[in-house]
Regions:
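Carbohydrate transferase catalytic cores enriched for Leloir-type hexosyltransferases
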Residues: 1-339
Length: 339
């Protein structure tokens, strides 16, 4: 459809976390002409999945200042997509804002101060100004209604997904895998404590993701840092099990990617994880270390259960595809623009 779209590209700078993946996978699939413009305050070096988009860089030392003062001036389009929860408060064109979670409000001590301030200061005004709101899960939509009074009719569920890149491999690995930014709310302290309590010989623990902050990983635990998609897929495919003990999530992409790659999954009941993983993974309550330990021991010693979860996870992941999410976002942007 003919629709001029400009996208706040801050989640794509410098490296992609979950919100960056969401932004890129949907932006690259938007069915609009001309191709969308991704604007940012610094160069976007990883253009995987967004090769067909157009780019605009207006260098600024701070992403929030750029969003609030530069983006409104350059937003010459029919509609803006704010994929990171906020939009410029002086924006003069229609906008759609995507909500991933409210952890900076519910768990401020588990975020950097600049993250808390940038989100909490602008979220209420952003939701008031947005024509439409996308939420990655029903849980986040309900929180937006309850805390900010967003009319439910304005909210569309646009979930995260996977594509055919994440597929089963040959397996063969003997390690427990965690993938995600190393930050307090991801429950890494719970995972490390439980892993340390496992009887010897225990499977190695591999932690993969950006360094983040306020998380100390002891010696003896493998840490890969950020890895590219090819390496990430291989890690998923070869894991004996994937464990995601997050204390709070809006959606949680890594368990879905792990399921698509055939890794048996243990995760917590938070955000959208029960929506897509119930019955296809072992789920425990956030912060329940005894239940997490029991689940790891159960899965480690039961090959038939691992095989069952592998097959169920692969099938379940097929219900969550980026193509469908991009279609929903295209429709939402069109509605917001009045096209």
């Amino acid at each position: 459809m003919n629709l001029r779209v400009i996208i706040d590209g801050r989640p794509l700078v410098p490296a992609r976390s979950g919100i960056g993946v969401h932004t890129a996978e949907i932006a690259g699939r938007l069915d609009v002409t001309p191709s969308p413009v991704i604007a940012s305050h610094a160069e976007i070096t990883n253009r995987q999945a967004i090769e067909h988009c157009r780019f605009r860089v207006d260098h600024a030392p701070n992403g929030i200042l750029w969003q609030q003062f530069v983006l409104p001036r350059i937003a010459d389009a029919d509609v803006l997509w704010g994929p990171h929860g906020t939009i410029p408060i002086t924006l003069r064109i229609p906008a759609v804002v995507t909500l991933h979670d409210f952890s900076s409000i519910t768990m401020p001590g588990r975020h950097l101060l600049k993250t808390v301030l940038s989100f909490n200061v602008f979220i209420s005004e952003s939701l008031d100004r947005a024509r439409r709101v996308a939420a990655v899960s029903k849980a986040i939509a309900e929180e937006a209604v309850r805390w900010f009074g967003v009319p439910r009719r304005l909210i569309e569920i646009v979930p995260n997904g996977v594509d055919d890149f994440f597929r089963p491999g040959d397996g063969g690995g003997d390690y427990i895998l965690f993938v995600g930014t190393l930050e307090p709310r991801k429950g890494i302290a719970d995972l490390v404590a439980v892993w340390n309590s496992l009887p010897e010989p225990r499977l190695p623990l591999m932690i993969c993701g950006d360094p983040g902050w306020r998380v100390r990983v002891p010696s003896g635990v493998g840490v890969t840092g950020w890895v590219d998609r090819e390496r990430l897929r291989t890690l998923y495919q070869r894991a004996r099990m994937f464990v995601y003990p997050s204390r709070y999530e809006g959606f949680g992409i890594p368990p879905l990617e792990a399921m698509a790659c055939g890794a048996p999954v243990i995760a917590t009941r938070t955000g959208a994880i029960p929506d897509y993983a119930e019955g296809a993974a072992l789920l425990v309550d956030p912060g329940d270390r005894e239940a997490l330990r029991a689940a790891i021991l159960r899965l480690q010693g039961n090959e038939s259960l691992r095989s069952e979860l592998r097959e169920k996870g692969i099938e379940r992941s097929k219900q969550y595809r980026w193509d469908r999410s991009a279609q929903l976002m295209t429709e939402l942007l069109s509605e917001a623009a009045g096209a």
